Amino acid sequence: MIEESRRPSLGDVRIGVLHHARSSLIRSGYMIGPMSDRWRARGAEVIDIIGTGTSVPLDVLLCHVDLSVVPEEYRRFAQNHPRVINLSATDIRKRSYLDDLVGIDDPYSGPVIVKSNLNHGGFPERLLEPRGSGLGRIANGILRRLRRRIGMVDEIRYKSDYVIHQERSSVPPVRFHDGSVIQPFRPERQDGNFVLREYYFLGDIEILNTEVGSDPVLTTGRQVECIQDSPPAEVRAIRDRLRLDYGKIDYGCPDGEVIVYDANKCVGTRSNPGEAVLKLAAVLSQGIDTWIESTPSS
């Protein structure tokens, strides 16, 4: 298992974390929360920057705008800083990096999983939408449940809405045109459970975490391994394509073949992370040294 190594003080270092102007979740539920705690423990000042209205002197800025497509104003704001993490990671929609997606006319006939093209079912985007009235939200929830009960296809709003079909032909045609993506369902299995491999990274710190669980869709399970190591070449290629300095990529290795499932640049956690997550965050946080020691951009 991974262990945090002793690192030098970050005294006098100012680290900024850039969030969307309407973000209601700053650190709770994100890996950046316990990582920031570790930076502070090493003496750094960590500053949350909400929106692009105010600029403060920083040594490093981490772009943490939790949208599948980052608005241009945030990239412009970020590039004015000397060292920027995830400056060029501006589009993580699944169509931008998954090469095995199935189209309506493709001959593929095996099991498929229907996902949202947006990260996490588009939930981060909806968090930034103006909130409707309480009665309106209740009515919309009831309508969604009724539509499902009578078999009508509804939009994918959460990861729990992802659906597995045993044949491509059983996918409702609307799913090929409504912002969904259809990927062959090729999970890695172990003793009847589903295996999820996670590649966490910040700079030159790379962590491979493996979980097993009974749910084929939701990515929470029992941790069976967590080591510092390099990922398979196919996984690193996705990181390079998305130009990610910090993030997480989910994948599996069914029958020895590497299959990428998902990528994220604003890594989430539970609101009260357990010891395993805190240890992972502590080791991952040390990747900030890559930027502290680098030459500032002109």
Q: Where is each model-derived feature located?
A:
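Short beta-strand-to-turn element immediately C-terminal to the catalytic PLP-Schiff-base lysine
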Residues: L127-P130, L202, Y261
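A long amphipathic alpha-helix within ATP-dependent nucleotide-binding catalytic cores
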Residues: Q183-F185, L208-V260, N264, G268-P296
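Conserved N-proximal alpha/beta basic substrate-recognition cap immediately N-terminal to
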Residues: I2-G134
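Generic beta-strand structural signal
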Residues: V13, P107-V112, D178-S180, R197, F201-L202, C253, ...
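Short catalytic/ligand-binding loop motif for oxyanion handling, primarily in non-cytosolic enzymes
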Residues: V69-E72, K94-R95, H120-P124, D191-N193, ...
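Phosphate-binding site of ATP-dependent enzymes
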Residues: L143-R239
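Conserved anion/nucleotide-ligand pocket segment
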Residues: V112-I164
